[in-house]
């Protein structure tokens, strides 16, 4: 892409970046989920992958609505988070058990917080650009992510972390 000079161009560039981010997170979760031992955690990770796929379809729709070629732009930020997630949940992680589940939740939340930040930013851009429907849809995606994050926190605090002690 050429040099960005307008908020509109930045908006589309960020949408494409988020698409890549989502794809990378789903790939990471697909590798991590089989290592989770708490049944509720496994279920939550599977549900999350479906939610991320839904948000990815939204991103594609929003990119297309801007008259842009529907393609993603590789997100190096998520690439780093995914590398850390794999390291801490597979490569250098306990084989199984509550400590591993706690690590999985921690890494999931790091990646999710990146998504919350990115989607929140593009939602604000959409508002400034008076793309009201985009703003509303992106805001709903942020709410979904917050809810997922809160559910992971509840699981960690009510079960996994105490089991890991």
PLM features: residue spans?
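Amphipathic alpha-helical hairpins
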Residues: 1-165
């Amino acid at each position: 892409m050429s040099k960005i000079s307008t908020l509109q161009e930045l908006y589309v560039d960020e949408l494409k970046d988020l698409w890549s981010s989502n794809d990378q997170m789903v790939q990471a979760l697909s590798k991590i989920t089989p290592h989770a031992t708490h049944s509720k955690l496994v279920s939550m990770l599977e549900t999350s992958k479906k939610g991320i796929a839904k948000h990815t379809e939204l991103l594609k729709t929003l990119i297309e609505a801007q008259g842009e070629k529907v393609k993603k732009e590789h997100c190096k930020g998520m690439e780093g988070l995914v590398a850390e997630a794999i390291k801490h949940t597979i490569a250098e992680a306990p084989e199984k058990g509550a400590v591993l589940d706690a690590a999985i939740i921690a890494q999931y939340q790091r990646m999710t917080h990146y998504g919350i930040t990115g989607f929140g930013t593009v939602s604000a851009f959409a508002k400034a650009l008076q793309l009201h429907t985009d703003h509303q849809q992106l805001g709903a995606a942020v709410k979904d992510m917050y809810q997922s994050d809160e559910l992971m926190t509840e699981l960690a605090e009510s079960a996994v972390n105490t089991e890991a002690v």
